[in-house]
Amino acid sequence: MRRNLSHIIAAAFNEPLLLEPAYARVFFCALGREMGAASLSVPQQQVQFDAPGMLAETDEYMAGGKRPARVYRVVNGIAVLPVTGTLVHRLGGMRPFSGMTGYDGIVACLQQAMADSQVRGVLLDIDSPGGQAAGAFDCADMIYRLRQQKPVWALCNDTACSAAMLLASACSRRLVTQTSRIGSIGVMMSHVSYAGHLAQAGVDITLIYSGAHKVDGNQFEALPAEVRQDMQQRIDAARRMFAEKVAMYTGLSVDAVTGTEAAVFEGQSGIEAGLADELINASDAISVMATALNSNVRGGTMPQLTATEAAAQENQRVMGILTCQEAKGREQLATMLAGQQGMSVEQARAILAAAAPQQPVASTQSEADRIMVCEEANGREQLAATLAAMPEMTVEKARPILAASPQADAGPSLRDQIMALDEAKGAEAQAEQLAACPGMTVESARAVLAAGSGKAEPVSASTTAMFEHFMANHSPAAVQGGVAQTSADGDADVKMLMAMP
């Protein structure tokens, strides 16, 4: 149905207009099409447009670098996308309305911002208690995918719970305010029964159906135990998926996420739980993000993770793989997966679960450990670490090489240097374990101790041994250290190493 454009027609015809001629042609082509005009004549330019020509003229103008209207505001190169109210699937709008925000609208806005040359980053301004599970996981995956193109940050202002927490976790960085509420990583389902009310009213409803589960959960009868059990299994699976997504996006372990037991964290406690990165005033969010982006453009680094935080997350990832339930009986494969950069705990668990358990071995001590503790390694720890890291090296091959190498000058042992670190104070037990790790260096120990300061958790002897074995085989510092020590006296050792198969 043609729109009523009488007010525009009245202003456009028989009235003086201040229009540039080329744009005037486009304007009247567009208006003529809306009026149902079959043609447009411009005598001064000797141009005649028929109906298809009017459409082509309008389309050509719109395609000539004219971007579609934005559905977000841009401040300092930051596109601010509001995410408020209940989150729903297929709302059909790009802006929140009637207390709801659609997952489809969030994705559409993000895609538009990614294509907008004036947008350097996106800030999701979130104030939502959550919403539907339907569509939530796909939306979160899209946020995670699009953040590879431009930074996407989340501001919890002041609530980002449940489904909103899922979306926030998919962002590059999460900001919280002093009174923010974040978390609630869990799933719920409700059932209503009108059976008692109908009985009192004398109403009897008979459901006629085909298929044993066709009317499961209907509101006309009390919930049967077997149906309740099925529903419980469904929400347990959904919670597991929820936790795995948050863990993948944030770098936390699944156990750490599920360990929150759907608790809600306020302000600083959200950061301590690993669900947020920085506490700010909501009014400063845009300037904080813009400053970070400016720093990155100038060659600085995005203040997303300090070196200590990065080391802590990497250690958590490694230990999450080595100590997960699926790694039992598959320790060798778990160690290999832990050494793969970017391998998440969830991905490793899936691979381990599909793999057959490895055959048990007679000894739990690795060949690398045997090389490091042999008598000939005393005073030659760096060379021993180099040998221990070599494929197919055995203690029998290493001993004559170590014996032929001169011992290092007497000085503080690696253990003494590590134990003397400031970071070792209050963490002596962990420092002792690090000092015993094959291939460990003072700087590596310092970083690990700093990352674990005040947060170390007791681990079993088998877990410690497994972690030490991983460090022995995946520490580049050990190999570099061995090479760096080659001098005139060590040339023979290097030549002997190079000649080995």
Swiss-Prot record:
CDD domains: S49_Sppa_36K_type (cd07022). The keyword Protease applies. GO terms for molecular function: serine-type peptidase activity. PANTHER family: PEPTIDASE S49 DOMAIN-CONTAINING PROTEIN, PROTEASE 4. Residues 321-455 are annotated as: 3 X 38 AA repeats. Signal peptide: none annotated. GO terms for biological process: proteolysis. Its EC number is 3.4.21.-. TRI repeats lie at residues 321-358, 371-417, 418-455. It comes from the Viruses. Scaffold protein GP6 forms the scaffold for capsid assembly and is required for binding of the 5 and 4 protein products. It is subsequently lost from the head during maturation. The keyword GTP-binding does not apply. Keywords: Hydrolase, Protease, Repeat, Serine protease, Viral capsid assembly, Viral release from host cell. The active site is at 162 (nucleophile), 214 (proton donor/acceptor). Coiled coil: none annotated. This is Head-tail preconnector protein GP5. Belongs to the peptidase S49 family.
